[in-house]
Amino acid sequence: NDMAIFNFQTGKPNIIKVIGVGGGGGNAVNHMYNEGIHDVSFVVCNTDNKALQDSPVPNKIQLGSEGLGAGNRPEKARQATEESIEDIKKMFSDGTKMAFITAGMGGGTGTGAAPIIAKVAKDMGILTVGIVTIPFRWEGNRKIDQALDGVEEISRNVDALLVINNERLRELYQELTVTNAFAKADDTLCNAARSIAEII
């Protein structure tokens, strides 16, 4: 079963795991991985097989068997994640003590899958921290409403939740282009996870 690929190097610290779920979370984790943060292990989880293949992160879980993404439908991502629940449990069964679940809320996979992955970790007694973004205003009300539902759901399944409001970030950095705005959001996610990991 090549749906879940784990290449955790032995002797490497698996105590803190940073899990990127969906497009936004995956981008943030790819970015952190490329920055060479060493004291944590990284995993990307996605319903979109292509996004997983494009990720430099060696540890990946494809959620569900289709591999075609969730098409902005959290319900579809939820079903896919339930299908892959054993892979998710296995990912956490290596001595993980703390998990950061990072996702962009508002799309399908981040919104639907992240709360379930967080719940698995928390149910296993792992200290679970959610770091999520909510969309820019121009992404539309439907996406924002969907994101807020996701935030509410993940908040029930984590020990701590950090919500990064992309719109607020844009107000702080008014000169940002759209691409840079997303990059800045990724940076903020990275810095948050890195800071918390260093405290511990």
Walk through the language-model features, giving the residues of each.
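Tubulin/FtsZ superfamily GTPase core signature
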Residues: 1-200
